[in-house]
Amino acid sequence: MGIDLSVIWFVIIVFATLMYIVMDGFDLGIGILFATTRDAQDRDVMVNSVAPVWDGNETWLVLGGAGLFGAFPLAYAVIIDALAIPLTLMLIGLIFRGVAFEFRFQATPSHRPFWDSAFLGGSVLATFSQGVVVGAVINGFSVSGRAYSGGVFDWLTPFTLFCGLGLTIAYALLGATWLVMKSENPLQDKMRHTSRALLLALLATIAIISLWTPLAQPAIAARWFNLPDLFFLLPVPLLVAVIGAWLWRDLRNPARHALPFILTLGLVFLGFSGLGISIWPHIIPPGITLWQAAAPPQSQGFMLVGALLIIPVILGYTFWSYYVFRGKVQHGEGYH
């Protein structure tokens, strides 16, 4: 049996996407949490907690997009055509977030509120757009032959908008628990209270999406509820409940600093796993599989050589930067 390059590339793209969600998720979450405080010192601590590492987080988004373009060109073409508007809005949000992140440090006191608002708005827009994209992927795409045949606004449904809200809550929880780990009181205590409210909202959102999805998509319902698959997949929602209860308990314990963030990562991973289980083996639901969308094996093999060289470098840089800038961030500290 030969090596299945399509599966390997799917794993690489999934890994890059998950790394992006984890790394840039709490970064965007901090921008979203600007809505919870107007205190200038608290906002400085929030931004300084990610200032040394945020530049490299979007590398994973570039890797995932480039991998999709090269390894699954049909999937890339359909997704770009079907989701042109939300993807464009996401990029606009990321640009605003990035520019505001840098400019707020250089701005005069009278101009800083503008850049703070741009940071908040860009973070919300980018996050909400990503959630809409996730919802649209779950809904599936109309494809005729090898081209997208749906409408310009097929992505715009109540379900996709709710997914946008859900991802916004998830990123905000990532950001809040990151600040529990990286900040000190009184900001840390405030983020504990905020995290508890966000956790309840996220668990409710997960429950609604978990019920809404199989009701709207019979194929996904069959995947999750038919025997014997039900027995193998049942641990996923059970783990969500267990981790949610564990996280709630630790957020009430002032001695716990890092564990709430780790548990939140677990919730994000389980949600991401649920998405993968629901659509596998389709890369363009409901009808195009990995192998139907794949590039020629020669192209995938050539790209794989480069990926195997660059991914360890990205991982090494990422872990080193987080190691160097570990520890708490205090008022008055900064990296600009």
Please provide the spans of the model-predicted regions.
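Alpha-helical transmembrane segments and their helix-start/interface "positive-inside/aromatic belt" motifs
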Residues: 7-11, 111-126, 193-198, 255-265
